[in-house]
Amino acid sequence: MKKAKLIFKDNTPFSLDFDDFYFNSKDGLNESKFVYTHSFEWKNQENFIIAESGFGIGLNFFLTLKRFLQTTPSKRPKKLFYISVEAFYIEKEQLREIYQKLGFYEEFKELLEQFLKFYPKAKEGIYRFYFEDCFLDLVFEDIAVLKELDFKADIWYLDGFSPNKNSQMFDGNLIFEVARLSKKNTQICTFSSASFLQKNLKKYGFRVEKTKGFRKREMIKAYLENELEFKDKEAYFSRTFSSLKNKKVAIIGAGISSAVLAYELSLRGFKIDVFEKHLELGKGASGNESGILSSLILKPKVNLGEFSELSFIEASRFYRQILDLKFKGVVEFAHNDLMQERFDTQRENVLFKISKNQAFLEEGGVIFPKNLVKNLFEKSKACIYFNHEFQAYKFENECFTLKFKNDIVKSDYAVLIYAMGADTKDFVFYDEMKLSKVRGQVTHLKPFLNTPFPLSSKAYICPVKDDLQVIGASYDRLDTSLESKEEDDKQNIENIAEFIDKNTKLEIIGSKVGFRSYSSDRFMIVGNAYDEVFYKEEYKALLWTKNKEQKLAKMSCNLYFNFAHGSRGFSTSVLAARYLCALINNEPLCLEKKYIHAIHPARFLIRKLKKGL
């Protein structure tokens, strides 16, 4: 990612990349208020979305958030979503220094320090920050990334240096995407009154009004007169906006994917009931004593690898923001030539500090799954029903009625979510969706190696906790036994041989078996259940029509999937939960389209139809 080149000129940040000031050198604070943050009225609605081209030093955001928090709750939206795109990265310490030099630091100190505490490294991606009743999605990408995003803004801040210095931020391609991501009466706020900007706004349906700008300057405001009719060549992956009869949600399964989802839903005011077939938490794969938060290391530009990296860093940031966890890092070792080749291609990646055959992932570390899942459920205030083995559902009058073993019935749920991990295989019956159930066994040893962070190679070693050290894990697609096996313990020990002296005597004090859920392409399966009959009929000619506009997809009901997280569910569950909340609650989707397509439940069927099969 490009780093911003800036200096101070006239006591104001000045961009060497664009030969322009970040904002008015005379009175930038009041100009930002006049042009952007105080130029519209709040609406008393569920979600209010502000989108911005050019985050800069974040001044517009902090002014907006401060105004939002100072407004009486009954006179503002329930939730503020703020999406800002920035192509030029400013270092954390430099941002703090800028606010101090400008004399803004004390005014924004509390919000700024909360932001800087979880500020990511200089790497492209969408990074979420949690504030009171507000989500900030900071998008570190070129502005062209807008074509990958999906939301309908109430307000747009078109910022980003003078148009004659940065024309890309105001050209026709950008304004088309701005219009696509807007709804009727969306307001455009901008300091510019450039004629070509006005022309582009009018071209895509905005009513443009000239108005007095800050001090003697002239500026414009624009309003979208009618929402664009936008047809998509990949409409089979598009969202369908949901309508809910109530805010009751049922989640089947009580593992990590369910726990993160329950917490995220609770932030939006949903009442969550969780149904678990076991008698307590921690009986499945999410119940190990210790585990590792880490990332796959694949070659650059590999979709699965990039998604794993984003999932990893966002999970790390989530656990630090929400649970105040502290991570000391994790060391990954290249244990064969293929792994070493991957390491060699990732030496410039800021997530991986690679030296020879080792990669240190600073944001990773040891996790304690049982405690983590328990804490998230407690924060969510979800009601967990143990000893409830799900059997079937009935959907009528826009609500679900659930049937459990022993003739137990629960009803009146607007949303049903499958998050039962490996057991999902018994409840999803799409022909093209191939799921596998993989057995894994971890071994509990008496402490034998003093390490502050996990070590991962053929197998992994966790730091000592409660006089116990966890190693693992085995991998078996064919074995379905719940019983621990001596040969698996032996294999786990053999796989950590590189970390211990051959004369070291290891004492096994226990084992635990769990089952992982995998898809055939290793991506998780997350999204709305789809209408298979509709898909097979409507998209049957995709072999010949895949480059033409498609009819919008049809979903079956408010049934959602959240499974096939494999062995990295503690990473992927965070993005899964945010994405599902966005679908259920009609929020901005927090993922780029390339990732949405990769995790969509219908992807296997679409691939088949594109081949004419």
UniProtKB/Swiss-Prot annotation:
**Single GO term (MF):** oxidoreductase activity, acting on the CH-NH group of donors
Region of interest (FAD-dependent cmnm(5)s(2)U34 oxidoreductase), ranges:
252-613
- Report the EC code(s) recorded for this entry: 2.1.1.61, 1.5.-.-
Xref: SUPFAM superfamilies: FAD/NAD(P)-binding domain (SSF51905)
| Main localization of the protein described in the UniProt heading | cytoplasm
Q: Does the keyword Thylakoid apply?
A: no
Q: What keywords tag this UniProt record?
A: Cytoplasm, FAD, Flavoprotein, Methyltransferase, Multifunctional enzyme, Oxidoreductase, S-adenosyl-L-methionine, Transferase, tRNA processing
Where does the record say this protein resides?
Answer: Cytoplasm
Gene Ontology cellular component?
cytoplasm
Which superkingdom, per the lineage? Answer: Bacteria
Q: Which Pfam families match?
A: DAO, Methyltransf_30
Where are the bilayer-spanning segments? Answer: none
Q: Which cofactor does it need?
A: FAD
Catalytic reactions of this protein: 5-aminomethyl-2-thiouridine(34) in tRNA + S-adenosyl-L-methionine = 5-methylaminomethyl-2-thiouridine(34) in tRNA + S-adenosyl-L-homocysteine + H(+)
Q: Where is this region: tRNA (mnm(5)s(2)U34)-methyltransferase?
A: 1-225
Q: Which GO terms describe its biological process?
A: methylation; tRNA processing
Briefly state the protein's biological role: Catalyzes the last two steps in the biosynthesis of 5-methylaminomethyl-2-thiouridine (mnm(5)s(2)U) at the wobble position (U34) in tRNA. Catalyzes the FAD-dependent demodification of cmnm(5)s(2)U34 to nm(5)s(2)U34, followed by the transfer of a methyl group from S-adenosyl-L-methionine to nm(5)s(2)U34, to form mnm(5)s(2)U34.
What PANTHER family has UniProt attached to this entry?
Answer: SARCOSINE DEHYDROGENASE-RELATED, TRNA 5-METHYLAMINOMETHYL-2-THIOURIDINE BIOSYNTHESIS BIFUNCTIONAL PROTEIN MNMC
Family to which the UniProt record says this protein belongs: In the N-terminal section; belongs to the methyltransferase superfamily. tRNA (mnm(5)s(2)U34)-methyltransferase family.
Protein name in UniProt: tRNA 5-methylaminomethyl-2-thiouridine biosynthesis bifunctional protein MnmC
The scientific name of the source species is Campylobacter jejuni subsp. jejuni serotype O:23/36 (strain 81-176)
This chain is encoded by the gene named mnmC
